[in-house]
Structures are given as structure tokens and as C-alpha cells.
Amino acid sequence: MASDMDFNGADTQDAAFDLIPANTLVKVCLTIRPGGAGPEGWLTQSKTSPALYLNTEAVVMEGPFARRRIYTRIGFRGKAAGGPGDDTYGNRGRAMIRGILESARGVRADDQSNAARGARMIRSLGELSGLEFVGRIGIERDKDKPDDTGRNVIKAALGADHAEYARVMGSV
């Protein structure tokens, strides 16, 4: 049994925690991690404010970063929602969801046809789970920890109008 537990030949962890470089384009598959809030329980309630968000996990599908997991919160309603001013957090989140739908369904952002408008509609937030799209990687750092190396997030979803879309999605 002891010979079955010999880890001398295992790879070192040197590169195991390296971040994916910012602005890298990757094909990902999105999963929503339900938080029990909002319609059908797909949203997560912030612990520090009335904000609601989608707690997502995106798995890189192919390429040198295949199988890497990227955790991103997509705003749905900000802490100022319902009060004075715009809901910037929620608006950014809705823009991200629109981008995910356009990317997954091959729709250009400037397409206003009935088919394109229909592609941007969902009946449930759960429909976002399982969608594959082109994501632009970003790096978020903890502002309270200046030495923080950060973590990868999906900064944007790229649609069919982006020059690299077809290559990353595997259409070309």
C-alpha cells in the first residue's frame, strides 16, 4: 500500500496557481451556483448589503488553460437599487448577461432583428447555466490587501462581431 502513495514523480505546484493573463480570450461553459434568493433561487444575497448577484463558475473548455475554473459575480441588483440614482452594479450585470447571450447564441450586438432580439431573452436565469461563450479574462485584486496577487474573473463576453470570436468558439 505504501508504494501506491509515492508522490515523488508528481508534478510540482509551481504553475498550479498562476493566473491566466489579463485580456486572454477563452471559450468557457458557465454554471450558476444558486444562492437561494430572487426568482427561482438563482441569485445570491450579499452578506453586507441588499445587493443581489449571480454567483457563477466558468470552466475553460480548451486551449492551454483548459479545465481552469473562473469564479465571477454578475450583479443583478445593487445596494442603491430602488433609491436615488442609477443601479450601476445591476446595469453592469445586465450588460454582462446580454453579452453572454449574444456570444453563446452567435448574435452581433448591433443586430436588432426579431431573431436577435429573441436570442437576448430568457425565461429564467437558470437558462444561463450550460451556455458556452467567449470570455475575456480579467484580474481582480482585493483593494484592502495591497500585496494580493488577485484572482481571475470574466471581465466581458465577446459576441459574433468581435474579430476573434469565430476562432475562439472553434467555428474556423
Briefly describe each language-model feature range.
Residues 1-172:
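Short beta-rich binding modules
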